[in-house]
């Protein structure tokens, strides 16, 4: 990374632990022994997280720079029977490699599908990474069939193993000039279909979507320009489309009050003789006093929506937790299905910091209770991942717990006073405020965006692709 201290001092997105690191690693670095540091029933696997880490600060205008545009860097913490290991790598985007054919940053979210690991953002197709090194293999276009961008939050259906996503861009769809499309990739990595989505207003900012077992849900928020302070004055629309639809003729649009939300927690459906409903949980703000250059989104609240598919109307839209949070996550095995717990990262107004997270939360859908975990004083973090406990680990009779909440929450944190990054592990069922483990990392890890847990069994399914996007001409070693 090429540094410029003057630029860093002028941008809030380059200060404190948002400042980029100057080194990446060529090999997995030893962190600690697994024994006595990691719970015995935590499955083997790797915690990966991407985030912005600008490569050349001399090219940045500090007045306009926002962390959404920072070059993606992926950090990995690998846990096996013997050791905990750490590695970081830049995503080899066009901005870094100076290849104009490679768009985007790969700095927003991670997804695993069909033996491939992807770094994603809204502005491009996903970057495929070589799992054992985290090096960039290619920008995936699914055999040339994907013409539009790939959203930051694709959904993997646990039943069909299909990958569902939405994105911007024109596409070769007859009789359509839509700028937004919904696509599905099957369990074998083949693009099955692309469906145009014609929004009724200017194309909104689209960051996430939802799926149930039979439907895909698209949000049409009244937010189009994030260059300055933004007000929400129009209605929100939810588009609900059967997952087996080949065009948008079966789309149902349901109206709700004006609001905005970046992230979906989960959605599911209920069908009986009297009702046919979609239920969805999102983090929303209703009066968006949001300024893009400050990322002051402390007003986010978890809302529970119910939509009646027969009447095509909203049944209810209720705030279910009064805790300000972001980055909602669930047990990923329950995407599209009813889930009991929604975990989140608690936002604080105590410090002046973009996305200031000072704890974790758990909302219980059955009881309506929200439990909070406070990070230690002066410690801030990011998105957590839920990892179920593994019973009979190391035996032929091993497996993952299916009990709601029986597992661990893993989150990367940063202790300001020590300038030290750490992996915190909490008990997801008890939600004890005391972490089970705190693992000191061998390098500072800047704050970032979304994370992913990959099981060791899935790691073994990664393809052995040796052709990589060329490395940086100037690289620092960890």
Language model features with spans:
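Beta-propeller domains
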Residues: 1-478
């Amino acid at each position: 990374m090429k540094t410029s201290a003057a630029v860093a001092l002028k941008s809030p997105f380059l200060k404190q632990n948002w400042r980029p690191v100057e080194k990446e690693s060529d090999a997995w670095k030893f962190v600690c022994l697994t024994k006595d540091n990691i719970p015995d029933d935590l499955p083997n696997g790797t915690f990966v997280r991407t985030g912005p880490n600008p490569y050349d600060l001399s090219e940045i205008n500090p007045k306009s720079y926002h962390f959404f545009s920072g070059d993606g860097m992926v950090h990995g913490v690998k846990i096996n029977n013997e050791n905990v290991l750490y590695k970081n790598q830049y995503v080899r985007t066009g901005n870094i490699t100076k290849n104009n054919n490679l768009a985007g940053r790969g700095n927003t979210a991670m997804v695993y599908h069909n033996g491939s690991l992807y770094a994603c953002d809204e502005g491009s197709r996903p970057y495929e990474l070589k799992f054992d090194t985290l090096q960039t293999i290619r920008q995936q276009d699914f055999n040339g069939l994907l013409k539009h961008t790939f959203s930051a939050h694709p959904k993997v259906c646990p039943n069909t193993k299909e990958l569902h996503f939405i994105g911007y861009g024109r596409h070769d769809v007859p009789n359509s000039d839509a700028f937004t499309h919904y696509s599905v990739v099957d369990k074998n990595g083949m693009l099955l279909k692309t469906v145009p989505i014609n929004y009724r207003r200017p194309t909104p900012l689209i960051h996430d979507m939802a799926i149930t077992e039979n439907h895909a849900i698209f949000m049409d928020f009244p937010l189009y320009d994030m260059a300055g302070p933004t007000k929400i004055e129009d209605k929100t629309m939810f588009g609900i489309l059967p997952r087996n639809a080949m065009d948008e003729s079966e789309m149902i649009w349901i109206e709700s009050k004006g609001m905005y939300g970046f992230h979906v927690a989960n959605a599911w459906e209920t069908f009986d003789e009297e009702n046919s409903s979609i239920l969805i949980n999102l983090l929303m703000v209703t009066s968006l006093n949001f300024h893009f250059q400050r990322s002051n989104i402390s007003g986010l609240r978890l809302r529970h929506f119910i939509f009646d598919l027969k009447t095509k109307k909203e049944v209810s839209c209720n705030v279910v937790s009064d805790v300000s949070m972001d980055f909602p996550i669930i047990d990923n095995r329950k995407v599209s299905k009813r889930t009991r717990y929604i975990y989140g990262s608690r936002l604080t107004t105590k410090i002046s910091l973009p996305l200031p997270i000072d704890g974790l939360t758990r909302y219980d859908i059955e009881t309506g209770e929200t439990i909070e975990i406070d990070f230690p004083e002066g410690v801030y973090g990011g998105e957590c991942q839920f990892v179920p406990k593994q019973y009979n680990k190391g035996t032929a009779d091993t497996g993952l717990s299916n009990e709601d909440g029986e597992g661990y929450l893993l989150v990367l944190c940063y202790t300001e006073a020590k300038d030290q990054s750490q992996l915190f592990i909490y008990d997801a069922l008890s939600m004890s405020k005391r972490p089970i483990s705190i693992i000191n990392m061998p390098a500072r890890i800047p704050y970032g965006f979304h994370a992913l847990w990959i099981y060791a069994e899935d790691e073994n399914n990664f393809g052995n692709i040796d052709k990589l996007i060329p490395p940086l001409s100037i690289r620092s070693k960890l």
